[in-house]
Amino acid sequence: MAGNKGRGRAAYTFNIEAVGFSKGEKLPDVVLKPPPLFPDTDYKPVPLKTGEGEEYMLALKQELRETMKRMPYFIETPEERQDIERYSKRYMKVYKEEWIPDWRRLPREMMPRNKCKKAGPKPKKAKDAGKGTPLTNTEDVLKKMEELEKRGDGEKSDEENEEKEGSKEKSKEGDDDDDDDAAEQEEYDEEEQEEENDYINSYFEDGDDFGADSDDNMDEATY
């Protein structure tokens, strides 16, 4: 091609001398030795103290950490539920204890409250009944009940009498209506019979031309 110099050789895109060696020189050998050690530090860490006191404090710290994790108010990150549940997780024991707070040591604002329904207004009937004089003695109560029963029986008897009178009046009106209907029906039947008799008695005398205008009795045609 016209852009390339020569055939079969590619031109370098950078200066080789800038890398540190000239043309024809060999590349440096690969170093297979470990790197040099980290230089010595001026400030070294303090050595750990050993003894019974230190071991006791370490054990106490671990126990405190475990007890804090077992408390019910310790927030744990929720585990992602896998599609396939492991058999071992099904029977794992939960070591958390149920925390029953002592509300004497905590403020009242933190205590949860259950919503209670407010009692509605009392019915008016109960108030009206309470306004009357209370009947304390049993004798007064019995007398009051007897009076009410007598009043109820009297009212019932009056109502029954009124119903009987109303039924009698209705029966009388019904009989009158039936009589009127029967009379009208008889008059209607008499009128029908008269009309039928008139049709039967409609005859012609001798010598009258019966059906003169009709075409059926004509022997010859008239022009």
UniProtKB/Swiss-Prot annotation:
It holds the Pfam family RNA_pol_3_Rpc31. It is found in: Nucleus; Cytoplasm. Induction: Induced by NANOG and POU5F1/OCT4. Negatively regulated by the interaction of microRNA MIR1305 with 3 miRNA responsive elements (miREs) in its 3'-UTR. Transcriptionally regulated by MYC. down-regulated upon cell differentiation. It comes from the Eukaryota. Residues 114-125 have a biased composition (Basic residues). Barely detectable in differentiated tissues. Expressed in embryonic stem cells and in other dividing cells, such as some tumor cell lines. One of its GO terms (molecular function) is chromatin binding. The modification Phosphothreonine is found at T133. GO terms for biological process: cell population proliferation; defense response to virus; innate immune response; positive regulation of innate immune response; positive regulation of interferon-beta production; regulation of transcription by RNA polymerase III; transcription by RNA polymerase III. One of its GO terms (cellular component) is RNA polymerase III complex. Residues 140-155, 164-173 have a biased composition (Basic and acidic residues). The modification Phosphoserine is found at S157. Keywords: Antiviral defense, Cytoplasm, DNA-directed RNA polymerase, Immunity, Innate immunity, Nucleus, Phosphoprotein, Transcription. Residues 110-223 are annotated as: Disordered. Its main location: nucleus. Residues 174-198, 205-223 have a biased composition (Acidic residues). Component of the RNA polymerase III complex consisting of 17 subunits: a ten-subunit horseshoe-shaped catalytic core composed of POLR3A/RPC1, POLR3B/RPC2, POLR1C/RPAC1, POLR1D/RPAC2, POLR3K/RPC10, POLR2E/RPABC1, POLR2F/RPABC2, POLR2H/RPABC3, POLR2K/RPABC4 and POLR2L/RPABC5; a mobile stalk composed of two subunits POLR3H/RPC8 and CRCP/RPC9, protruding from the core and functioning primarily in transcription initiation; and additional subunits homologous to general transcription factors of the RNA polymerase II machinery, POLR3C/RPC3-POLR3F/RPC6-POLR3G/RPC7 heterotrimer required for transcription initiation and POLR3D/RPC4-POLR3E/RPC5 heterodimer involved in both transcription initiation and termination. Belongs to the eukaryotic RPC7 RNA polymerase subunit family. DNA-dependent RNA polymerase catalyzes the transcription of DNA into RNA using the four ribonucleoside triphosphates as substrates. Specific peripheric component of RNA polymerase III (Pol III) which synthesizes small non-coding RNAs including 5S rRNA, snRNAs, tRNAs and miRNAs from at least 500 distinct genomic loci. Acts as a long tether that bridges POLR3C/RPC3-POLR3F/RPC6-POLR3G/RPC7 heterotrimer and the mobile stalk of Pol III, coordinating the dynamics of Pol III stalk and clamp modules during the transition from apo to elongation state. This is DNA-directed RNA polymerase III subunit RPC7. It comes from Homo sapiens (Human). The lineage of its organism: Eukaryota, Metazoa, Chordata, Craniata, Vertebrata. The gene is POLR3G.
